[in-house]
Amino acid sequence: MKLNDIREGNYVKEFEFSSRGRALEPFYRVKYDDLGYWHFMVGIPITLEWCKTLKMNTEIVIPTSTTRTNYDWIAEAPGIRIIEYNKAITVYHGMGGVKTILEHIKYVHQLQNFYYGYWGFEIDEENPTEFYKEPKNE
């Protein structure tokens, strides 16, 4: 299966260092607001509901007169952070060899030994636009 990655031209490599001065893996920052639509792959929109479906940790800012944040909502999972601010999506991830969110999810599942089970859905590799489906009970 060929996955379409549409990040070209919207992607810079950044490096971050820990407080101990130890270099971390390359950290990639991707801005999608100038594409007109925000996808990791064709057919998969990045929205707050999508992040909740993936069981990512999410936080929504409730606007008040004293709210001073630089995001409207934020979603995090191991190795990835997604931020929306003023209707622009910014994605940060530290998986250097991973080119699409499908590969990232597989990587995280394998790392945590949760592949096709813990999160309660399976990745439909035949049709990646149908990103998740309920597992079949046999």
Where in the sequence are the language-model features?
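Structural boundary micro-motifs
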Residues: 1-138
